[in-house]
């Protein structure tokens, strides 16, 4: 029997609940339904687009003049957007001779002008026309469409957010046709605030440049100017790039920037290399972070400078950040320090600061204290920045009271990490609400104050919940104004610092109530599930998952973002507690995964196999049901994944599993 009967029942119940909660699309207004029907009839003519456009204009104007629809209603409706996009596509194909026609069709640009006049043009229509014009080499006309788009946006109730990067990318490509590109001119063209270089959609331009059908000469211009813009950001705007752009990057964009940096001939810049190292490790790409280090050391002739060595401490610390046993991770930090820093005649403040930061990442606050007392020279302890890093470590120590900490603070806190640590200690100390507000106002408001980070705002949410008159009705997203672009980052930080199950449940409910469904995604739910496991509450984690898949109208509720935290969470419970009963939970969620994926993702395999190996090493008592899951499902999937996709686990995992004679490890895995 492949799966246990109990596990099958659990999976079936989940799937039935999911299937029974399909949410229908909101109904359109009757007037729009009438217009949709008339337009569908008008557009039946597949050959004479000129006649179609004339009939379209007559139909829309007739409905408007009869008082059925206002310009505002037309601007807000998207019910006919796709059908009108097909007209643009048909025009393009007829002009290229792909579709026969008895008349000369209106061009996509002419159709767009009509749609703009009728208040029916949408962002995707501007994109289609710009793509058509760029493919035909008409950059100036494409930029004219961009200007029309900006006029259209000014009429809309709100900008279109991340999706706007496509039309911005087409405008950028048109600009690249015209000559040598300048990053400040491009930013101005895109109608973005001066100095906000992060708004330039470079990654989208990378994606689209080869998909438009540009001539070879124009494609060359685009590639050359794209490289020039990257170089200007990396070299001329290096400070902004390191401080603003890199910390907000996730993997695809970060990897793209690193490739551009690597392609710059003769550039050996340890500040940039260190920036890439730290940010790759920030998103968990530790192997790539080490590649950055090795590449930079090679370029530097085998002698890493102080900046690179300091970054190495951060990377090694983050490698051990999620380790169950952080003693070994601390030993690796000590090994790096002894190998790379002890040999220096003079160790500067920046390196001691990097060492303290590494220990703070590992939550080894006792080590922060001992390094401060035993290793750091007295004259360096007077350094303002180093002192604040040390005090950050003190703020996290449970044996340092809030009054003791406040006595040691400088008059003005200028390190945002220290400020956040102080706020967090206040949020976790009863009766400190007024003190919290006073410190926040002094540090983050007024002239010369610090800029709040996502962690700052997350800590305000934590304090807001702790002091709410009725926590059961507290809405996190009504409590503190959060910029739209920071919402996800603030949510992630809150879930890292929250250790209260009831607060996590309330945060989930607040998210459902306050955020649009495209924002309240499975990624967010996965983070909430992960947070529940981190505080040891697997029952809340499961309850949130089940509620999400049965009440959300997201297109795909069961995916890697929601399943991986469950599989990782139960695997970690097995590792921490040597508790084999959680294998039945893994069995359930593996079955769900098998219904979503043709191949079980590698992350699932690795987490589960590591948990099984731990049980075998500790000689845990497994039931027949457990052995059936391991042998019939896990081992067979590991073998198939290696054969089909080349997935290979650490050999030590298999070696540990073979200690249990009742588990049959396929020979090809050994």
UniProtKB/Swiss-Prot annotation:
Coiled-coil features, chain-numbered ranges: none
Official protein name in the record: Meiotic sister-chromatid recombination protein 6, mitochondrial
Role of this protein: May be involved in the control of meiotic sister-chromatid recombination.
Domain of life from the UniProt record: Eukaryota
Natural source organism: Eremothecium gossypii (strain ATCC 10895 / CBS 109.51 / FGSC 9923 / NRRL Y-1056) (Yeast)
Keyword DNA damage tagged: no
Database matches in Gene3D superfamilies: Tetratricopeptide repeat domain (1.25.40.10)
Keywords for this protein: DNA recombination, Meiosis, Mitochondrion, Transit peptide
Gene that encodes it: MSC6
Major localisation: mitochondrion
GO cellular component: mitochondrion
Transit peptide location on this chain: 1-27
Species lineage: Eukaryota, Fungi, Dikarya, Ascomycota, Saccharomycotina
GO biological process: DNA recombination; meiotic cell cycle
This protein's record includes keyword Mitochondrion: yes
């Amino acid at each position: 029997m492949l799966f246990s009967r109990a596990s099958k029942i659990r999976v079936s119940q989940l799937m039935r609940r999911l299937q029974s909660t399909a949410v229908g699309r909101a109904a359109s207004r009757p007037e729009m339904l009438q217009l949709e029907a008339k337009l569908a009839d008008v557009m039946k003519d597949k050959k004479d687009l000129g006649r179609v456009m004339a009939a379209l204009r007559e139909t829309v104007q007739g409905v408007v003049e009869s008082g059925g629809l206002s310009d505002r209603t037309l601007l807000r409706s998207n019910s006919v957007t796709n059908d009108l996009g097909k007209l643009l596509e048909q025009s393009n194909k007829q002009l290229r001779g792909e579709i026969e026609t008895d008349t000369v069709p209106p061009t996509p640009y002419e159709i767009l002008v009509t749609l703009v006049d009728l208040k029916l043009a949408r962002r995707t229509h501007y994109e289609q026309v710009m793509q058509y014009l760029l493919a035909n080499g008409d950059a100036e006309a494409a930029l004219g469409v961009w200007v029309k788009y900006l006029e259209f946006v000014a009429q809309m109730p709100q900008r279109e957010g991340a999706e706007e990067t496509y039309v911005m990318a087409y405008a950028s490509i048109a600009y690249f046709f015209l000559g040598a590109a300048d990053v400040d001119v491009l930013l101005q063209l895109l109608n973005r605030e001066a100095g906000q270089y992060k708004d330039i959609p470079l990654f989208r331009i990378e994606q689209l440049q080869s998909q438009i059908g540009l001539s070879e000469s124009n494609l060359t211009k685009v590639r050359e100017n794209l490289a020039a813009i990257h170089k200007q950001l990396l070299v001329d705007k290096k400070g902004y790039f390191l401080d603003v752009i890199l910390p907000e990057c996730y993997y695809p964009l970060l990897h793209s920037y690193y490739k551009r940096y690597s392609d710059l001939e003769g550039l050996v810049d340890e500040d940039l290399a260190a920036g890439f190292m730290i940010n790759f490790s920030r998103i968990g790409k530790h192997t790539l972070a080490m590649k950055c280090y090795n590449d930079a050391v090679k370029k530097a002739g085998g002698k890493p400078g102080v900046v690179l060595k300091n970054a190495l401490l951060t990377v090694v610390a983050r490698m051990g950040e999620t380790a169950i046993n952080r003693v070994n991770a601390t030993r690796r930090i000590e090994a790096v320090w002894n190998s790379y820093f002890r040999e220096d005649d003079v160790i500067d403040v920046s390196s001691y600061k990097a060492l303290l930061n590494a220990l703070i990442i590992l939550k080894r606050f006792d080590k922060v204290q001992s390094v401060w007392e035993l290793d750091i020279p007295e004259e360096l302890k007077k350094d303002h920045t180093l002192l604040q890093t040390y005090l950050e470590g003190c703020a996290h120590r449970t044996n340092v009271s809030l009054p003791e900490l406040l006595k040691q603070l400088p008059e003005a806190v200028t390190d945002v990490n220290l400020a956040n640590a102080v706020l967090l200690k206040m949020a976790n100390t009863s009766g400190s609400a007024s003190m919290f507000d006073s410190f926040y106002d002094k540090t983050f408001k007024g002239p010369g104050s610090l800029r709040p980070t996502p962690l700052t705002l997350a800590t305000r949410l934590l304090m807001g919940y702790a002091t709410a008159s009725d926590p059961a009705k507290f809405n996190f997203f009504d409590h503190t104004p959060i910029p739209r672009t920071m919402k996800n980052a603030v949510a992630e930080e809150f879930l890292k610092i929250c250790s209260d199950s009831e607060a996590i449940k309330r945060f989930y409910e607040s998210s459902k109530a306050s955020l649009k469904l495209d924002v309240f995604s499975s990624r967010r739910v996965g983070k909430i599930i992960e947070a529940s496991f981190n505080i040891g509450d697997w029952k809340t984690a499961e309850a949130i998952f089940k509620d999400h898949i049965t009440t959300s109208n997201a297109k795909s509720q069961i995916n890697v973002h929601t399943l991986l935290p469950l599989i990782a969470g139960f695997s970690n419970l097995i590792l921490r507690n040597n508790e084999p009963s959680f294998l039945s939970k893994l069995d359930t969620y593996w079955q769900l995964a098998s219904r979503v994926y043709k191949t079980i993702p590698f992350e699932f395999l690795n987490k589960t196999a590591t948990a099984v190996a731990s049980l075998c090493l500790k000689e845990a008592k497994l039931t027949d049901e457990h052995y059936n899951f391991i042998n019939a499902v896990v081992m067979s999937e590991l073998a198939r994944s290696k054969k089909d996709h080349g997935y290979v686990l650490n050999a030590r995992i298999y070696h540990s599993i073979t200690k249990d004679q009742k588990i049959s490890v396929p020979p090809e895995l050994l």
